[in-house]
Amino acid sequence: MKLPPKITRLPIVWELRKLTLYKLSVIKTVFKYKRFSIIRDSFVYFPIWWKLQQRKNEPLKNDRPWITFSAEEFLRKILRKDMVVFEYGAGSSTLYFSRRVAQVFSIEHDKKWFDHLQHEFAKQQITNVVCRLIEPEAIDENSENNYSSDSPSYKHKTFESYVKSIDAFPDKYFDVVVVDGRARASCITHAKSKVKPNGYLMIDNADRKSYFKGNDFLFDETEWRVFDFVGAVPYQFDFAQTSFYCYTPNR
């Protein structure tokens, strides 16, 4: 039976719905990955997940990147004040990094979001972030496009300039490179050589196989150690995977 709209808007109904969706995500993720540690972690991170689901929460105010909770714990342990970070995709993670490392370079494709972030940087007096707006460019529908986005919103658009922005930096320059924006498969290809020895390439939503299209061969197991973190994510019901590729050429 479908409940009347007034009933579904009641706070208790909304809270029960959130709890149900969280449980379903736990079950679905356990079956997908066959990892029972996901059940343990779902209890550990449930209180903070629940708190961040409150309607008045603003992601830019919470000092928490939009990655799995277990990945954020790992990230907090590896970051140092002398590090330099590059990000494809600016947002709450940019603010998070700015408080923990020396310098952050971020690339954003959406002008409205970019303008909002610029206001937030000024408001919070953040001075160690260089954030650039690089919007996608229109191309002919028959043109070959190796820098496309999976999103239908960007059909017949190329993110070539966006992806290649990291090429302006020397190889092995960054301690951490974050791939959490558009055209991720291409971003991974260009970002790999920019990671320092013992540095990290962080890929959010790494469970989406399309992001690794053509990139599987890039990560030689003798040079890259992989750390996968599967579980709950702030502000959303679906669980996800965040992966860190640590560049260890001399091990």
Question: How should each PLM-predicted stretch be described?
Answer:
Residues 38-45, 50-52, 100-103, 120-133, ...:
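P-loop/Walker A phosphate-binding loop and immediately adjacent motor/lid segment at beta-alpha junctions
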Residues 118-171:
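S-adenosyl-L-methionine
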Residues 61-66, 82-85, 152-157, 177-180:
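Short, flexible loop segments at the rims of nucleotide/cofactor-binding pockets, characterized by
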Residues 166-171, 176, 181-251:
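C-terminal substrate-binding/active-site "lid" region of AdoMet-derived donor-dependent transferases
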Residues 1-66:
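Membrane-proximal basic amphipathic "stem/tether" segments
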Residues 69-73, 95, 160-164, 172, ...:
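Short, contiguous clusters of charged residues that form electrostatic/catalytic patches at enzyme active sites
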Residues 56-61, 78-79, 173-177:
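Short, basic, glycine/proline-bearing loop/turn elements
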Residues 69-141:
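SAM cofactor-binding core of SAM-dependent methyltransferases
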